[in-house]
Amino acid sequence: METQTLEGVATETENAPEMVKVLVEKRDGRVVDFDPINIISAVKSAFADLDKKIGPQEERLIRDIANQVEAEIKDRYNGPAKIEDIQNLVEHGLIEDHLYDVARTYTNYRLNKDIERAKATDINEAVRRLVDRDEALVRENANKDSNVYSTQRDLLAGAVSKASAFSMLPDAVSNAHMKGDIHFHDADYSPFTAQSNCSLPNYWDMLANGFTLGNAPMGSPNSISIAATQITQIMKDVASSQYGGQTANRADEHFAEYAKKDYDKFLEQAHEIMPDDLPIEIAERQVRMAKAVEPKRLHFEKDRPALPMDEPFDKTSDRLQQLREIWAKIQTRKAIYDAMQTMEYQINSNRVSNGQTPFVTVGFGLGTDWFAREIQRAIFLNRIRGLGSEHHTAIFPKLVFTIKHGVNADPGDPNYDLKQLALECATKRMYPDVIFYENIVKITGSFKAPMGCRSFLQGWIDPKTGKDVEDGRMNLGVVTVNIPRIALESHGDKDRFWKIFDERMTVAHQALQFRIMRCKQATPVNAPTLFRFGAFGRLGANDSVDQLFRNERATVSLGYIGLYEATSVFYGKDWMRDHDWDPEGKEFALSIVKRMNELCKDWSTAEGYHYSVYSTPAESLTDRFNRMDREKFGEVDGVTDHDFYTNSFHYPVWLQPTPMEKLDYEKDFPYYASGGFINYCEFPCLQANPKALEAVWDYAYTIGIGYLGTNTPIDRCYECGFEGDFEPTEEGFKCPECGNSDPDRCNVTKRTCGYLANPVQRPMVHGRHEEIAHRVKHMSGETGHVTLDDGSEREWFEEAK
């Protein structure tokens, strides 16, 4: 229902002396102060839906109706008036003033909302939406292919779970979600089940000490190939036991010990093929031959230079022993490469019980010994090569590379060469995203990779050991608050904004408390891999899982969306511009996140569970909240004039700051939203200019950015050979050269939010598609090229302002 923004609304009650307080009982049982602006807004909405002009006389009539309703409540009610009674009084007032068509529209709107509320908890309605392939349902998650049986089964189960969920939730929470005031995430899994969200599973304890998966007890692996295979099996089971992403934290350092076992075996083989009596020249020839075929064995492209000859670990040993060590290194490098390739293919070919590829992230980059370095190299080489004969960009795992001074940040650091490989990989495959070691420690209290795409644990010291613990911890769920709606409902009055804000935070807190309570109802036998065999802990069958959550070991997240839009209500839509912004506007936007952070700290101290502020990725929520607010408030400049809301604290995607300007604006927010954050920059094709990307990475590191993603054109058309940015269409994307949009004849890779996705194969919701279509580059450069039949080149170019 359309409503126009109210400006300068004043009621007689605002300036009247304090009299009897008029109270209202909401549908969810909450009691709040009567606010005449709500009636004025609703009646003006009915006028707008009828295209009726509101002049001075109509303004007076509407205001009189609101005052009459307040007076009648005072006369007729000793306690709070119910919402339904107030609506009846409004309808009666409209009829008495002969506004019959307005009364009918007002009544119909009320009836439609009652029907929507009933439908939300109707299982039959949920199933009907799925059968009718409601876009908001089948395109909610870009990682789910709704055409396949396993996903259809999951969507059916999710639809039933979601309908049941709103009957299980506290009334205030359920009502706020259905109205669009808040969003209770993942209601297709929780609270119907007691599942938790994302995590840093302790795969490393499981690999080291053994575990049971299904009917198979597993011992500790004796090679990196078995370690990689086992970890993908664990990932599959973890993905079936939680609904969020999972991350292999510091994978290069942990995998290194299994690569060392391969090296030891190859060294034994080297003693067999190079016995003590073997002439040195023959041994040297064997090593040269092994090195000569290495580029082919590692699938090097023709233009990639071969790796230099390896050096032995022990340079003081005799020459024959040195050659054995070099030969063992060459063989181990191949074993590492194959293991990382196995992991890449197994993760991408898995489809778990929830009908999707597991949301997996691999964090790496800090290992400096030979084995960890080779693991990093293998991860990059496999990702650069791509999947299959057409070398498709792998969507999973998400790669998160750590940059640290003294390790890889600067020329002269031992792993600086691997930073160069990371840059090459990012320009060709968009991943890795990068995290900056010292900045992550400053923001979150300790170092770790994100859980899934952007959720971060805070630093936590185990009171039993006094040591920092990251692996084996998790997030219990997210509730996101619709910040633009609060601003719209405030009608530009900041005092009113903060009043409504506090009310919404109270409901969001109640929702998060419910999430904690529900997760605590899980038992170890519900998810043995998580609770019994080491991913989260090694509990007994009847132990309480709460010991893994309390004392702030786990996190639960308060999310937000649309700071740009909310601030536009108070400072106008031009408060952010291509190259600068209104400092007062930024301070207001920052004050919202600061206030959320203060509340989370208070709740954590009072309850012993870690509440964190989370910059919600909003893959489909960007569509839902915006759509609901457009229905309620109409098209409001700077707020609902796009079909999406801006993610969290980000610079609006249609503006064109330089990468440095964008990061300068955004850098302060993660320090108050340490439970989840990421920054992005939009680049042209940078494969020929990786140093430009390195300059941005280095700048981000210098100014305190913690986590940075690279968005660059990497789409490919297999019909005409185009490489670059596919053009957005109404439903998807097409090749700008030949118009091809056949998912079997192109590879389109876009960042939906934190993860990458192929929107041609798996279309996304309308709002997210619109958001991607509105993105502009923050740097001038080529955005695509194709070689024509006559051998000439055609290029596409985007000019930054």
Feature names for model-found ranges:
Residues D35, T729, G754-Y755:
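Conformational switch/transducer regions in large eukaryotic molecular machines and scaffolds
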Residues N112-E116, A120-E552, K573, H579-D582, ...:
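Conserved catalytic cores of very large enzyme subunits
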Residues Q246, G472-L476, R550-T567, R624, ...:
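Conserved phosphate/anionic-ligand binding catalytic regions in large, soluble enzymes, centered on
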Residues K52, K334-M340, E344, V569, ...:
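Metallocofactor- and cofactor-centric catalytic cores in central/energy metabolism, strongly enriched
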Residues V22, Q68-K74, V360-T361, E565, ...:
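Short, hydrophobic beta-strand segments
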Residues G739-A800:
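Long insertion/accessory domains within large nucleic-acid-processing enzymes
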Residues E2-R133, E770, H774:
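Charged, amphipathic alpha-helical regulatory modules used
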